[in-house]
């Protein structure tokens, strides 16, 4: 049973207490961070809030024993929410955050909403986000070995050919300074070529495709490239 309360008697009897109670003791099921001195911080200086403390205790178990996936979820999702919750905003992206999005489930001052019902909606939403983030982290880690193998087996180190689409940019950047293009099959059955960005997140390429190809399709592109099945650039 999930109870939202600050009643000290109820808190004392609870099996697990999160974000209230003024105590952090994972073995005793106490996960608050509001006490004087907080509840510790990560190696990168981001302090733990209650979400991070719960994830620290149960994250690996939630990720079916995969410590790498659990760490990826912490670094990509949990630690950001912890940073915002603890006011440690340096380095946190500006704009609307997941924390703010979830807080929008609370009734506004103009609404006569049921706070508990809104909380349950927020929990369902946050649970779905967490599930998808875990799946994404697991997929990214699984993809790394596939891309690494493609880099190792490439006939030309400048062109990496994948047998199926997998997320590749982070792995290519970490393992290959020579790769310029990545080729892979699309869902439509066609093959695609993508340029490798100069840096992760950059729109600048290590080596762009010829400018004369840009915006061409079908026969026009086929004529200029010499490829009789080229479709669009």
What are these regions (language model features)?
Residues 12, 141-143, 174-177:
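Short amphipathic alpha-helical surface micro-motifs
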Residues 149-233:
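Gly/His-enriched, cation/cofactor- and phosphate-binding structural elements
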Residues 82-167:
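Hydrophobic, aromatic-enriched interface-forming segments
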Residues 11, 73, 122-130, 183:
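Generic hydrophobic, helix-prone segments enriched in Leu/Val/Ile
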Residues 4-6, 30, 36, 42, ...:
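Arginine residue identity/basic-tract feature
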